[in-house]
């Protein structure tokens, strides 16, 4: 894995599933509920909130910049149209010493997928490494299979190779990183 994108060593990180999960020194992921918590936003010095949903309405605080990415959490939704623009936006906020919160409804699929795209583009991490890192910071992440297919294509665009592949399983096509888990859940 390349240098860790987080500013502090693994043993000092506190993975969070209900609040804001810190991914890098300037990027966080959360649910829609947490994204509307003024205390959480201010205590983490969030300057930009990116809402990756069609169902969550943000409470608009005047000192925070809001970006709307209206994408449903369905395998056919084209989240890939936002990989570059959102990664670029997160990077530009970081260059201005700001902090970004990416959120969707649960902080599991859409926001996680955009986080993985950002880590690949701006931290030169493979998709596998980006997923491993992000999951260590927010254990509940699990982009839907359509987003995985789009991320796999994006990784190939960026690096000319893939570290994650879609494979056949008893429940259909899944990313190979979930293959062992699925096989343990479903007896053959």
From Swiss-Prot:
Entry-linked PROSITE patterns: TYR_PHOSPHATASE_1 (PS00383), TYR_PHOSPHATASE_2 (PS50056), TYR_PHOSPHATASE_DUAL (PS50054)
Active-site residues from the entry: 104
Region (Sufficient for mitochondrial localization): 95-141
GO molecular function (one): protein tyrosine/serine/threonine phosphatase activity
Source taxon at top rank: Eukaryota
Main location: cytoplasm
Enzyme's top EC category: hydrolase
Domain Tyrosine-protein phosphatase: 19-160
Membrane topology, record value: Peripheral membrane protein
Compartments, as annotated in UniProt: Cytoplasm; Nucleus; Mitochondrion inner membrane
EC number: 3.1.3.16, 3.1.3.48
Reaction(s) this enzyme catalyzes, per UniProt: O-phospho-L-tyrosyl-[protein] + H2O = L-tyrosyl-[protein] + phosphate; O-phospho-L-seryl-[protein] + H2O = L-seryl-[protein] + phosphate; O-phospho-L-threonyl-[protein] + H2O = L-threonyl-[protein] + phosphate
GO biological process terms, semicolon-separated: dephosphorylation; peptidyl-threonine dephosphorylation; peptidyl-tyrosine dephosphorylation
Pfam families according to UniProt: DSPc
Keyword annotations from UniProtKB, A to Z: Cytoplasm, Hydrolase, Membrane, Mitochondrion, Mitochondrion inner membrane, Nucleus, Protein phosphatase
Record's GO cellular component terms: cytoplasm; mitochondrial inner membrane; nucleus
Job description of the protein: Can dephosphorylate single and diphosphorylated synthetic MAPK peptides, with preference for the phosphotyrosine and diphosphorylated forms over phosphothreonine. In vitro, dephosphorylates p-nitrophenyl phosphate (pNPP).
Family under the similarity heading: Belongs to the protein-tyrosine phosphatase family. Non-receptor class dual specificity subfamily.
Protein name as catalogued: Dual specificity protein phosphatase 18
Record gene name: DUSP18
